[in-house]
Amino acid sequence: VFADPVPAMYDFMPGVERARTAVSPDLDPDLIVVCDGDVSRTGAVLADNAELFGRVPIVNIDHHVSNPGNGVAAAWVDPGAAATCEQVTLLLPHLGVEHDALGGAIAQLLMAGLVFDTASFAHSNTTPRTLRVASELVAAGAQLPMIARRIYRTKPNAQLRLFGRVLSRLETSVDDRVTWSVVTLADFEAAGATLDQAEGLIDLLAQSATADVVLLFKDLDDGVRISVRTRDGGVDATRLAGAFGGGGHARAAGASHEGPFEAAR
């Protein structure tokens, strides 16, 4: 069960057709496992099932440093993990689950999480342990080249048009150390793109040769969503996002602002 619909870019992943955004009323679990965020990040899943979440023990597995790990039966928060999928890969053998289970489908899914959160193992969050875990997943059947290509190097034309509009209004500070842009609902409509196709925009902006801090503002109906990227050894992105009640990692974080774009900017 996911807090949001699975974006179309992941339609190649095994079992994606089983993804749901609502809990079946017939479900009576003994345990709830919340991954990749604290329980509050489950959004409508929590709001629509408050009685269930209050009654059933919760285990929280996450790698975000901003997660306090509170209010659950057990929490494993490891900011040293590149992705929650790294933690799950380490956990599975202790549960008696082989990495090549389900014909390699589990390895495919876990590798996709590693590839996404490390930008194909290019980010500084990639550690020796991350690479060891990845090698185990490849040995278990994960198709690393295909996964990296589908996540980072395959984009519909509508998404490319959207990127072009956002890049055309790129702004920088006087010293070029801060770079930002905004994507609006009008951009999505003009490009014929969907909201999830803004994925990857912030990483493209972060390729700036001079910027220490990069921001992307998504000006949407329900407010402004802010994505932050910072250079290694520089500003802590969680401190910037924290000013808006957000969080994440030292180099990549996000937040939301209920007011207009100009106020957030």
Task: Identify the function of each model-found stretch.
Residues 1-11, 28-29, 111, 115-243, ...:
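Hydrophobic helix-and-loop "lid/oligomerization" segment in the mid-to-C-terminal part
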Residues 1-52:
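N-terminal small/polar loop signature for handling phosphorylated ligands or for N-terminal nucleophile
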Residues 3-6, 61-66:
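Short, polar loop motifs at secondary-structure junctions
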Residues 15-20, 76-79, 232:
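Short, hinge-like loop/turn segments at secondary-structure boundaries
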Residues 25, 37-40, 64-66, 185-186, ...:
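Short glycine-rich anion-binding loops that position phosphate/pyrophosphate groups of nucleotides
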Residues 30-33, 57-59, 213:
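Structural motif
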Residues 44-47, 71-73, 228:
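Short amphipathic alpha-helical segments
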Residues 63-133:
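Short alpha-helices
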